[in-house]
Amino acid sequence: MSEVLPAPSEFPAPVTSSPDLLVIAGEHSGDEHAAQLVRDLLQQRPELQVACLGGPQLHAAGAQLLYDMTEVSIVGFVEVAKHYGFFRALFERTLDWIERYQPKHICFVDYPGFNLRLAQELKKRALSKKGGGTIGLSYYIGPQIWAWKAKRRFKMAGLLDRLGVIFPFEVDCYQDTALPVEFVGHPFVCADHQLPFRYDPKGAVLLLPGSRVAAVSRIFPVLLEAFRLAKVRQPELKACVLYPSERIRGVLLRILGEFPELQSAVVLKANSSEPQVARAVLMSSGTMSLAVALAGIPGAIVYRLNSLSYWIGRFVVRVKSIGISNLLLKKQLHPEFIQAAAQPKVLAAALLRACDSDAAIAASRGADEIRALLNPGSATRAADWLASEL
């Protein structure tokens, strides 16, 4: 079933005639990372006027919210194509707002399909510095060119003024371009960042089906059936499912209603500032999988796409793993079950293995290895990087 996206209405005028900074972040993870960046930035420079296309966390951090991008999160070639008209309208609204109000600087956060096209059009319209205009363009958390579409780096060098990356190895990926690239630290390993999860051998099983409606609809039934089968073997098991928005909660409730025997064993919780304790996890491959790995929680990664999107992806994606922790360590810290391999019986067995103490020891060692690789540095390193341009 294809979800219906709300038509983008006209964006509000900025608080000031020309804002200092426009931040554009798609998806819940981008909203979270961008919010921390803006929070740190405004602590240094409270006089700055910041507007954003993002989500509730960016708004809470002090940015004027022009449009909630977290409500329109979609992944997959086919899925994006189905909603081309919507994204085209959103793209034009964004361009019109930028052209009318001329923010001094734009910081793109992840979301490359939208953001790089926008940077290209800003250059074409002579609005960005690369096109002879006045608007500076920074990019925080760049596209995963090490995984696919590596040639984008040359296009980026012609569009952007600078790039801040969150993995140390990414700097080398741009060595053959003229783009200034700086490793600004990963937000999950900064000294003042509290991970959303914590390992506890007596905790619940964590089920993380993702933050996109289509992905949750596809993955959550499989996770619930796997949990049900595992619970037959270990009746004491309980599960906790975290959700990022009321929209996703509605999807989860509908699917959970199809498993009446699990009603008393599965709890739905909104994401919060308090860490969720867990003994094991079944999760999608998104940003939260790295947070789980850093918390030392054993488990497995589950990934299912539209069949055509998956078939196309096999020809363009160059990496052997989809979990960032597995990519960083070059080993399967969390076993991956992709597409047809994501069968409930197999996942149930993986979940039961993850509940074993040996799995917890391996997960803890993996967390230490990842933390050492990401080299935390200054907690405000990303904000310092962006502030130098404002």
What residue ranges belong to the model's regions?
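Nucleotide-activated sugar donor-binding and catalytic core shared by glycosyltransferases
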Residues: 1-390
